Amino acid sequence: MISAGDFRNGLTLEIDNAVYQVIEFQHVKPGKGAAFVRTKLRDIKNGGLTERTFRPQEKYPQAHIERSDMQYLYSDGELYNFMNVETFDQIALNDEAVGDSLKFVKENDMVKMLSHQGNVFAIEPPLFVELVIVDTEPGFKGDTAQGATKPAKVETGATVYVPLFVNQGDKISIDTRTGDYMKRV
């Protein structure tokens, strides 16, 4: 059992016979009255978002989530195909199950597949990936005072904002949680 005061992003809970994943949480301590926890929850069965408020002392059972290492094989336009690296079983998922979690993942990269009672509800890419920039405008010295960025398209087709000194053909590290440029590799 987990109390509402211990909620964290990514935590999965069973509430009212449904399984939810905490997307956002905020501890609120008003000047008058009792503290509470404001959350945004995602139903893992249908993907619907719900906002709900809890008292910090309320307790809920944590849902058992299976995490399996999978290799992203390819996309055929409609389905995304993965292979379990231990059993070599292949699984195909549609856009709804995958979402935008693969925008920084290349074919044959490793990901984590999250499922509850056999139903896949999310794909977790690695925290950091290294990708090559395939298209960006050249940056010129003296363009700006400080901290300017420009859009760059990486080999997976996603767009990332990078500093002006990064050029086409450079390999960069990207934080997949935020989509931010981290460093040039």
From Swiss-Prot:
GO terms for cellular component: cytoplasm. Pfam families: EFP (PF01132), EFP_N (PF08207), Elong-fact-P_C (PF09285). GO terms for biological process: peptide biosynthetic process. GO terms for molecular function: translation elongation factor activity. It is found in: Cytoplasm. The keyword ATP-binding does not apply. Pathway: Protein biosynthesis; polypeptide chain elongation. PROSITE patterns: EFP (PS01275). Keywords: Cytoplasm, Elongation factor, Protein biosynthesis. Involved in peptide bond synthesis. Stimulates efficient translation and peptide-bond synthesis on native or reconstituted 70S ribosomes in vitro. Probably functions indirectly by altering the affinity of the ribosome for aminoacyl-tRNA, thus increasing their reactivity as acceptors for peptidyl transferase. Belongs to the elongation factor P family. This is Elongation factor P. It comes from Lachnoclostridium phytofermentans (strain ATCC 700394 / DSM 18823 / ISDg) (Clostridium phytofermentans). The lineage of its organism: Bacteria, Bacillati, Bacillota, Clostridia, Lachnospirales. The gene is efp.
